[in-house]
Amino acid sequence: MKRTFQPSTLKRKRTHGFRARMATRGGRKVLAARRAKGRVRLCP
């Protein structure tokens, strides 16, 4: 059985990156919540 985590920088950025977050309304809400909480990193 293969491991479920197969790291890829491109896939990571495309799904969880800043631009991906900004593209949807829900993603913008995520960023707003993380800013309100005072997170150092908004996106991984």
From Swiss-Prot:
InterPro entries: Ribosomal_bL34 (IPR000271), Ribosomal_bL34_CS (IPR020939). PROSITE patterns: RIBOSOMAL_L34. One of its GO terms (biological process) is translation. Transmembrane segments: none annotated. GO terms for molecular function: structural constituent of ribosome. The keyword Ribonucleoprotein applies. Keywords: Ribonucleoprotein, Ribosomal protein. Belongs to the bacterial ribosomal protein bL34 family. NCBIfam families: rpmH_bact (TIGR01030). This is Large ribosomal subunit protein bL34. It comes from Thioalkalivibrio sulfidiphilus (strain HL-EbGR7). The lineage of its organism: Bacteria, Pseudomonadati, Pseudomonadota, Gammaproteobacteria, Chromatiales. The gene is rpmH.
